[in-house]
Amino acid sequence: MTIRVLLADDQALLRGTFRMLFDSTDDMETVGEASNGQEALELARAERPHVVLMDIRMPEMDGLDATRLISESEDLSAVKVLILTTFEDDEHVAEALRAGASGFLGKGARPEELLDAVRTIAAGEALLSPSATRALIKRFLAQPDPCPADVHERLECLTRRERDVVGLAALGLSNDEIAEQLFVSPLTAKTHVNRAMTKLAARDRAQLVVIAYQCGLVSPAAESGPSPASE
């Protein structure tokens, strides 16, 4: 599958650089360029990209508002947003995930890291750079959001293994890495993630990460991962 990428950044030079990178990659193509959030929303509807590479600070409509409108549009449910920005602070990371972004990466990332990030997002997984993960932890420790009552009730439906998997996913681990931590197959890890998403009514893996932090399923002390539990 060729991954269709839409670029949204107010700097034409950066868009040109990204276009050359994606168009020179066998499994990707650039389907459009937007210089502000409004253009990004319109092009997302017109081109139906798999991934929108979104800057935060843009004129007319910023990247967070554009991301929120894309994620709330039923006709754009298949479109994933990867935030690429210089602002990897705690508030921006939290707001981006609340808006519906599937990933968050700093502009200092190497080209191969960006390409891998786009592939990860297109495959339906969430992605946070290590610094973004630390910022998210800091944000929820300093000013934790209350766990919504309906979500708190759904947490009771999670098995111990599903709680383990959600916690590891919130730390940024892929299905393969979760499988290695818990000594299960990647398919089993993916199944547990999908079941947890269904039980918690999470629209995607990124929202699952937000729920994990809001409801205390992950903390800095969990960096080494939970101990293996029985299937």
Model-found features: residue ranges?
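Short amphipathic alpha-helix used as the core "switch/output" element in two-component signaling
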Residues: 42, 64-77
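Active-site beta3 strand of CheY-like receiver
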Residues: 47-53
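Short, flexible helix-to-coil linker/hinge segments that flank and couple to helix-turn-helix
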Residues: 93-98, 103, 108-160, 214-220
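Receiver (REC) domain active-site loop signature in two-component systems and cognate sites
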Residues: 58
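Recognition helix of helix-turn-helix DNA-binding domains
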Residues: 172-207
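Active-site residues of response regulator receiver
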Residues: 9, 55, 85
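Basic, Lys/Arg-enriched C-terminal extension of HTH/homeodomain DNA-binding domains
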Residues: 40, 197-231
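Acidic catalytic/metal-coordinating carboxylates
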Residues: 36-39, 61-68, 88
